[in-house]
A protein has these predicted regions:
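Active-site neighborhood of HAD-like aspartate-dependent phosphohydrolases
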Residues: 12-65, 161
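Short catalytic/ligand-binding loop motif for oxyanion handling, primarily in non-cytosolic enzymes
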Residues: 31-34, 39, 95, 104-108, ...
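Substrate-recognition element of Asp-dependent hydrolases with the DxDx(T/V) motif
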Residues: 71-76, 80-113, 117
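Substrate-recognition "cap/lid" segment bordering the active-site pocket of phosphatases
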Residues: 98-146, 156
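Short amphipathic alpha-helix with an adjacent loop that forms part of the alpha/beta core around
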Residues: 137-142, 179-190
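Acidic, Mg2+-coordinating phosphoryl-transfer loop and its flanking beta/alpha structural elements
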Residues: 146-185
Length: 193
């Protein structure tokens, strides 16, 4: 067996035929972050909390959830299971999570996000907790653009800027058809290249 044949064999075993990894964000896509905030404050809708303009609500919420198990307690979106199934159908059975930690509470928030995943959804192939999601935009070995499904436009922009394929999706606002179309379009983009 030549070195070339070995390399080819290893390459083919590691590669899923140039298939992308599909990364799903957690908050806003699978887990209802704002639903968690509403529950914590005992309000019907989080916008009720924005009436007091003297407060920096974002800072207050972050201060209040830092060091707690907040992320483990988030409600799951009703569409989460179907979204995961859709991704698995596209990839041939795989999906990964790529979620950001809470700034200033990295280890703790990562721990409770992982606990949420363990308790609420089937186990992903990989769980990545990073503030730099875009470093996973392309497969390092093959250069295949990976897919990110995320609710934040800035994350999608950075992902695309790093050569990945982004699908902007907010579970409380968008239909799963948006994800379905995004996955179908990825296939078309790849075929056209």
């Amino acid at each position: 067996v030549t070195i070339d044949e070995n390399n080819k064999k290893l390459y083919n075993e590691d590669m899923t035929d140039g298939k992308p990894t599909v990364y799903i964000d957690m908050d806003g896509v699978l887990a209802d972050f704002f639903g968690g905030v509403e529950k914590m404050y005992g309000v019907e809708h989080w916008k009720q909390l924005t009436s007091d303009k003297t407060k920096d609500l974002k800072k207050e919420v972050i201060d209040r959830i830092t060091g707690t198990d907040f992320f483990a307690t988030l409600p799951i979106f009703g569409s989460a299971g179907e979204l995961i199934s859709m991704v698995k159908e596209f990839t041939g059975g795989k999906f990964s999570i790529n979620t950001s930690p809470l700034r200033g509470d990295h280890e703790n928030s990562a721990k409770y996000k992982k606990l949420w995943i363990q308790n609420n959804i089937e186990q992903p192939d990989e769980i990545i907790v990073t503030g730099r999601k875009e470093s996973y935009a392309k497969d390092k070995a093959s250069g295949t653009p990976n897919i990110l499904i995320d609710d934040r436009p800035v994350n999608i922009q950075r992902w695309q800027g790093a050569g990945g394929y982004g699908i902007l999706y907010q579970a409380n606002r968008d239909s799963l058809d948006k994800v379905k179309k995004g996955l179908e379009d990825y296939g078309k983009v790849q075929r056209d290249q």
